[in-house]
Amino acid sequence: MKTVEILFWIGLFIVFYTYVGYGIILFLLVKIKEIFSKNENNKGVRDLPEVTLLIAAYNEESVVDSKMTNCLELDYPTELLKIVWVTDGSDDNTNTLLANYQRADVLFEPARGGKTAAVNRAMDYIKSPIVVLTDANTYLNKEAIMEIVTLFNDPKVGCVAGEKRVLSKDKDTASAGGEGLYWMYESKLKDLDSRLYSAVGAAGELYAVRRELYKHMEKSVLLDDFIQSMQIAMR
């Protein structure tokens, strides 16, 4: 066999493994593990902890009202759910609109230092044991907070990643549909990763951490969600 043919088949194998093979092997490993492991169900009703929903936003006036409506509809005791916005550098009507909502705590500094710096600063203010981080243009299922909290019943869990679903509009159904399929597959892989040992990263649209495990990151960090979740998984 010629060198070119060998390289071709090696390259083809790498592509196949990356997009399909890894998922197949992961699925088989999870099934083998579950056959020989005890099924521990940590879900159930326990004393609910105080939770802070943290939203880092910059000039998000177009979604403030819809986001707050979504937050206020979440199925979690009002007295245990704090809603904190950090809006550093915003110079539109974001802060003005948020002032209309009594439950919205707003942290604001005129200078914009980036999302990572804003989240770091907000974490110094937050005291609740569980912090759920989400984007201003991300809308949560009503049960999302409750589902996340139940996973923290397991003391070995330090970070929980949410599942992203893309909502499509008529004008871009094809492109959004393709993105939606990608995220469905990505979410399935993360689910299998967590069942085998641990997921290898969380999407910034929705993830939660134990406050005590959060570590400040350098302002220059761009993938703050990935870095933070990986640091927790490594402990």
Please give the residue ranges for each predicted region.
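Glycine-rich, basic loop-to-helix element that forms the pyrophosphate-binding segment
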Residues: 109-126, 146, 184, 227
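Short aromatic/hydrophobic "clamp" motif used to bind/position activated sugar donors
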Residues: 131
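N-terminal membrane-anchoring/stem segments of glycan-assembly enzymes
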Residues: 1-43
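Conserved donor NDP-sugar-binding/catalytic core segment of glycosyltransferases
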Residues: 142-177
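Short, acidic, metal-binding catalytic loop of nucleotide-sugar glycosyltransferases
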Residues: 69-80
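Cell-envelope/extracellular polymer assembly enzymes that use nucleotide-activated donors
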Residues: 49-52, 82, 227
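Acidic helix N-cap motif at the loop->helix transition within catalytic regions
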Residues: 62-66, 80, 92-100, 143
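A conserved acidic beta->alpha catalytic loop
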Residues: 52, 70, 86-95, 111-112, ...
